[in-house]
């Protein structure tokens, strides 16, 4: 299974949710978490493995062609049982599209679950690997900015004809209700999460994620995927 996670707007916690979903899936099957967010500092920082040895995207620049998924997985740092393919904050560089396609295909053939932290701009531009995804999760706040962002994503999601769900973050004081966001964006509402102040306080550095609103959102997504927690 390949699962994409994308934010309807910046700062909604899409990378955090992607990481926690991957962590949960890794309890049931071999799992890799892949960083495709072009503007981020690296998922390895988010999950706290930035100092762990292993390959990042720049190390795979020559990996085009016939790539063996087992070889890639063996090179990657681990976050618990989950392999992590991240950008490198010290070596910011664009990934060659051909290399990205070959590496993702190899990983999808090797692991039981592949979780992609998608770049919102790449999705809108048609450069994200949506066709490879079995499901895409859109993360939004309960506000008009997220509605507009989700609507911008919809044409590409519709073209991919993949299953898609919506996770809405917000609280009782949110400008809109989660059902309003789902209705306006045309996406199925999978979960409503209250604002996680503890997560914000620790700068969205993700631990194993056993408790809290973000953890419950990840549990809800995994239930929707039907793999189990």
Q: For each predicted feature, which ranges?
A:
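Walker A (P-loop) phosphate-binding motif
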Residues: 1-31
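P-loop/Walker-type NTP enzyme "switch/lid" segment
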Residues: 7, 33-109, 199-203
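Cytoplasmic membrane-interface segments at the C-terminal ends of transmembrane helices
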Residues: 27-28, 60, 141, 156-160, ...
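Short, well-ordered alpha-helices that flank and scaffold nucleotide-derived cofactor binding pockets
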Residues: 19-27, 45, 152-155, 183
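Conserved catalytic-core segment of NTP-binding enzymes
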Residues: 32, 98, 103-104, 108-202
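Residue-level preference for the first positions of well-ordered beta-strands
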Residues: 2-4, 30-32, 82, 112-115
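Short, hinge-like loop/turn segments at secondary-structure boundaries
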Residues: 49-53, 156-157, 182-185, 207-211
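C-terminal boundary of histidine-terminating zinc-finger modules
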Residues: 201-223
